[in-house]
Amino acid sequence: MQLGIHYMNFTQPGIGPEKMGPLLRETAIAAEGIGSSWFTMMDHYFQMEQFATAHDPMLEGYTSLGFVAAVTKRMQLGLMVTGVTYRHPGLLAKIITTLDVLSEGRAFLGIGAAWYEREHQALGVPYPELKERFERLEETLQIAQQMWSDDEGSYAGAHYQLAETINVPAVVQKPRPPILIGGGGEKKTLRLVAQYADACNLFASDAATVGHKIEVLKRHCDEIGRDFSEIKITMMGAAPKAAADPDGFLRDMEAYAALGVSLVELANIGPDPVAAVRQLEPLVPRLAAIGA
């Protein structure tokens, strides 16, 4: 099983705006140093209110990943996950392309239907009903795939119309950067995973729930003739638990790996993210042995 580090907290004691960049840089370097496979961040204008407050600091995700790309060499980079409403899909595909080029082929598109209504209303970003957000999500996936292909023609959807899908330079990864869809909605989200995605990200509530979601995804794959084994199953976990009880954490991961999970993202990396990441280093080889 692989490890990913999810950087979601910009509120650290004594860290003002002028020190956020250096701290992010050192955390990313530490993550790569311990053997993390992924480095991800959130895609929000405001900090999540279930985690802190809307007035706590939050940096724009893709700008931040471009910064991280310049100081790392190996880790895959993406947002967990991009809200489909935040950027026009043509622009989003161009942003991912740029990140892929500048990182020498390490970008992936993590995307979902968006949910944080307050930040949309605050900054004047349209926030349609859930049904329409899922329609826009599917069209965005189609547009991204077209822009990462040789097809430079038009795109005509119910919500988005593009006259030309020119995208130069092309992405480094072939045939395209991986697409990850976040969430475990059984009727729509997991169906879109089966149709369009290379990976999904599930919340690690418990092994039974994750196992059920995976079985639903398998059924969607069977219905459309998709090879389920092509899809990378990832999940979110908690770094504090992993550090405090590594043996218990690894036992949990063995159960998830048996279900098909191949990467765990550890979030909530605390007031000293560099130290928190380094504390995870002994887990990495033991985690890698699971499912090997």
Question: Language-model segments: which ranges?
Answer:
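Flexible, glycine-rich active-site loops centered on histidine and acidic residues
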Residues: Q2-M20, T82-S154, A208-T209, I269-P271
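An alpha-helical appendage that flanks or caps ligand/catalytic pockets
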Residues: Y7, A30-E32, S37, K131-Q173, ...
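N-terminal beta1-alpha1-beta2 module of alpha/beta enzyme domains
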Residues: M1-V71, P175-P177, I269, V274, ...
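Hydrophobic faces of well-ordered beta-strands that scaffold small-molecule active sites
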Residues: L3-Y7, F39-M41, Q76-L79, A107-I111, ...
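Conserved, mostly hydrophobic/aromatic
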Residues: A31, D43, V68, L99, ...
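Structural motif
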Residues: I34, L102, Q195-Y196, L259
